[in-house]
């Protein structure tokens, strides 16, 4: 097909669409109902989302670009903030949802520390602590052996000679409780 034939088809399709809009009564009624339903509503010029719990609709002027359609000319508008929140379920005003996860994580961390479960506590902390302890216990993981010698399959000898007061503190309840409180203070910041 040539370009002129494609243009003729596009023009005919557009003409048929316009004729259908003018001749089909239910299409006219639907357009009128839609316009009548939203006639009293104010069009949205800008939507500003500062955070999940903070959602503002502003009526400030939008930047105009001659190639773009003005947002105020658009037929899209929201009747209320509630409608928007039901449409976009991630816009919740209830901030307690986000605090619950942090509270549960901190409680688990404190309990692991109080019951002297050091490795559970270590795995709950960010990955950097685990990496530091792994590097101290298994120094062979820090570098790749380049020699041609045959190494045993068990590459990690794990000489865990860590002089860490955390292991000693775990046997004293008051020290462990103090450590747990410091950890929870960090979690709640």
From Swiss-Prot:
Protein's name in the database: MyoD family inhibitor domain-containing protein 2
Entries under InterPro entries matching the protein: MDFI/MDFIC
Pfam family, one: MDFI
Domain spans labelled MDFI: 28-188
Family: Belongs to the MDFI family.
GO BP field: negative regulation of DNA-templated transcription; regulation of JNK cascade; regulation of Wnt signaling pathway
Coiled-coil boundaries: none
Annotated GO CC locations: nucleus
Organism: Homo sapiens
């Amino acid at each position: 097909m040539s370009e002129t034939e494609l243009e003729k088809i596009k023009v005919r399709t557009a003409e048929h669409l316009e004729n259908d809009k003018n001749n089909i009564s239910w299409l006219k009624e639907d357009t009128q109902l839609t316009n009548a339903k939203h006639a009293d509503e104010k069009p949205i010029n800008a939507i500003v989302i500062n955070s999940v719990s903070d959602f503002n609709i502003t009526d400030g002027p939008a930047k105009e670009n001659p190639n773009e359609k003005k947002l105020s000319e658009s037929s899209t508008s929201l009747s209320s903030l509630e409608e928007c929140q039901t449409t976009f379920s991630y816009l919740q005003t209830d901030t307690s949802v986000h605090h619950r996860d942090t509270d549960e994580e901190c409680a688990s961390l404190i309990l692991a520390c109080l019951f002297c479960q050091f490795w559970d506590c270590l795995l709950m902390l960010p990955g950097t602590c685990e990496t530091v302890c792994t590097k101290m216990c298994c120094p062979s993981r820090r570098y790749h052996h380049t020699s041609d010698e045959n190494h045993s399959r068990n590459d990690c000898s794990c000489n865990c000679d860590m002089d860490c007061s955390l292991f000693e503190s775990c046997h004293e309840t008051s020290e462990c409780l103090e450590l747990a409180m410091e950890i929870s203070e960090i979690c709640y910041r």
